[in-house]
Amino acid sequence: MSRTSLTRRSLIGAAAATAFAPYVKPANAAAGPIRVISHRQPALEYYTDQMKKALPEGQVSVELMPIDKEVELASITMSSKSDAIDVAYLNDTTMQKFAASGWLEPLDDLWAKYKAEFKLDDFPKSVIDSISYNGRIYSMPILTNTEMFFYREDLFKESGTALPKTMQEYFDAAKKLHQGRVSGTVMTLKPVDGCLNESHWYLNAIGEGWFDKDWKPIFNQPAGVNAITLMKQMTAFAPRGFTSAANDESTINLQQGLAAMGLQWFTRAASMDDEKKSRFVGKINWIAPPGGGQRIANDGYAISKYSSKDKNTIFRMIATAASQKSMQKGAEFAMPPRLSVLDDPELAMRYRWYPAARASLEVGKPFPPMSDFLDVGAIVTRYILQAVTNEKEVKAALDQAAQETTELLHSRGYYK
């Protein structure tokens, strides 16, 4: 799309923006416009347009591009300590890497200063955790995604099965509903991403997480062993090929009635009610995952440490884009991270999975705030898959994963 052409959604967003964008102190025109770089997709087109509307015309420059190009440009610019970029769109994993490199402006003081004005306490703790590194906030949350618990409401009612609140109740329900062509639960264990997400849930809901406060692995301790042992037992009720099942495969299994329940992303909920894709429209419902601790992911906008523009002005600009009224409209494009928006009755009528999304946000957990976590995940998931497929005993597999994780983190300076 050219810079002069707009999608219908962009036009709608632009028309709505002036109705609720609070006035923000103009940037210093002599210093040039605030430069924002961002990934291109409908939701981000909308939110970057809100940034442009937050300041007088010409005070904000927005450049939209593919995510790989945007991250590359931000990396090159910030690593050279250039002030050529003021604001960059970053997902939570990339934000961790940039914050660890010292390229981002900590936002804690600005957050406290403008907390009341922009109702920043409307973001749940799980979202704040996902935009923080070493206890400091580095990004304004814009888009969020959470895993939720999908279930066939008709099967639960017909069998008199109570909705699970704990992982043991989840196991019992999966065992009970595992009949005929219907598997008890989906399990998304394709490496690395699928298995890492599923393991994250088990290790938080049953175990004590991944690391202690000094980044020493604890997933091989008794609670972690119990978590992965239950995960192994649960595979008896999963569809065939669960070790190669990614999100697409698990989504299809739910849509086609080949599984009674399981963990999947918020972004997959709408397809359950799509008559062209789902055979069970209106029969699938959602709750927060049993035990909580499932993965949430959050994307936002961070301020470059090297920006020469007024940081108060920049912060107010991105806070305007992330305001309650802005996200009320933005909910048309993507899940908003504000609880007040997810509570909106009108939105709940339009998107019946929103109440479960809100409940899931409150109990979810982001990946550990470690810039090297995906490398850790590649190690650990390899051994978890060996454990759940009986190639190794669970304890032995997790011990080996912990040893290799410790060696990796030691080589990267995590331990004194």
Residue map of PLM features:
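Extracytoplasmic/periplasmic solute-binding protein
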Residues: 21, 133-142, 147, 171-217, ...
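Short helix-initiation/N-cap motifs at beta->coil->alpha
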Residues: 65-74, 167-171, 242-255
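Hinge/lid segment of periplasmic solute-binding proteins
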Residues: 93-146, 171, 198, 281-285
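Short, solvent-exposed loop/beta-turn-alpha elements that line the ligand-binding surface or hinge
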Residues: 108-122, 189-190, 206-226, 274-279, ...
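C-terminal lobe and pocket-closing loops
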Residues: 267-280, 290-382, 414-416
